């Protein structure tokens, strides 16, 4: 007979769980859909907008337009004799000491500020040109980073990576921990003692040392991150499942299953693990934020995902390095990371309270 733990209901009184689920769902939805509609690839570099400030208004402003125009004129060895903006079009009068090659005007379309230029009038044997240059409007809600990449898109892509690592690493920890703890608790005796001594030995290993060794052996890879974290975090899960198994195997329905000739794997799968589902789910709800925090810490140390991919830990590390002049690089990733961790911690606490 299976006596499952009581279900956790989303009643109006359980508002912390409802609020946590709403926040997590919103963050996951934004991270999933946001990069598709932002208009900026996460790895695209805007050289004319390095460390641009966050703004809901479109770039370029007057200063950015002037600086971009001066840079192009310098590279083309031209003089800007007159400049007038009419709506979204910049009217320029250009001159040089020699005839201007029209192909040189391609420098405008290669910039992030202007669209392809159009020659309106040619004078003085090609040494003077009247040119119309449309402006290229771009919005950076969260600004740009030190490489000129859109921080809004990168923050949401980082959320995908961090959430994926949190879920996958927790799944690895769940799979290993439940199997290991159930076998140890059901076997008992010397097998249980030996298996739990192994757990204690692995517990004694420094987490960062373990990660560094694996990175040196296998290299930095996205899959390695959640495997490494999951291979460490299963230890706590194993202890919880082992304790539950020691209690459950003394129940009458387990003795009845043994008397009927059920095999040990069948008893564990059909009777022991289902009856331990309450504590397992509660621990899993607390484990996910821990895993995300560990991934952020590993990425902060430079052992996480590689460029051009990113995670919240990588962005927080970049923001910490540039906090003096560009605090927005730290604020936005930290807000997303903090909100996710707080919601997960609240969800785990509410779940644990509801399964008691």
Residue ranges of model-derived segments:
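Gly/Trp-centered helix-boundary motif
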Residues: 1-173, 322-342, 351-356
């Amino acid at each position: 007979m299976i006596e499952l733990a009581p279900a956790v209901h989303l009643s109006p009184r359980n508002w912390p769980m409802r609020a946590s689920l709403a926040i997590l769902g919103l963050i996951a939805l934004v991270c999933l859909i946001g990069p598709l509609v932002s208009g900026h690839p996460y790895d695209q570099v805007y050289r004319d907008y390095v460390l641009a400030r966050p703004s809901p208004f479109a770039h370029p402003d007057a200063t950015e337009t002037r600086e971009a125009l001066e840079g192009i004129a310098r590279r083309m060895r031209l003089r800007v004799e007159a400049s007038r903006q009419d709506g979204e079009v910049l009217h320029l009068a250009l001159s040089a000491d020699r005839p201007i090659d029209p192909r040189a005007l391609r420098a405008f379309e290669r910039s992030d500020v202007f669209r392809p230029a159009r020659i309106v009038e040619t004078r003085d044997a090609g040494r003077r040109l009247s040119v119309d240059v449309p402006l290229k409007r771009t919005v950076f809600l969260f600004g740009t980073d030190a490489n000129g990449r859109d921080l809004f898109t990168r923050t949401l892509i980082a959320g995908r990576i961090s959430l994926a690592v949190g879920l996958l690493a927790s799944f690895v920890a769940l799979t290993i921990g439940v199997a290991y703890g159930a076998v140890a608790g059901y076997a008992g005796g010397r097998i249980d003692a030996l298996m739990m001594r192994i757990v204690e030995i692995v517990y004694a290993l420094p987490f960062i040392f373990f990660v560094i060794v694996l990175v040196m052996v296998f290299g930095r890879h996205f899959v390695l991150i959640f495997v490494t974290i999951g291979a460490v975090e299963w230890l706590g899960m194993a202890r919880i499942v082992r304790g539950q198994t020691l209690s459950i195997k003394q129940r009458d329905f387990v003795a009845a299953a043994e008397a009927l000739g059920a095999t040990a794997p069948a008893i564990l799968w059909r009777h022991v693990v289902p009856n331990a589902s309450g504590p397992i789910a509660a621990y899993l709800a607390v484990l996910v934020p821990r895993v995300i925090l560990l991934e952020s810490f590993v990425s902060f140390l430079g052992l996480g995902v590689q460029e051009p991919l990113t995670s919240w830990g990588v962005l927080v590390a970049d923001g910490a390095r540039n906090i003096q002049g560009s605090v927005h690089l730290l604020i936005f990733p930290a807000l997303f990371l903090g909100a996710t961790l707080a919601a997960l911690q609240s969800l785990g606490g509410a779940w644990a309270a509801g399964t008691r």
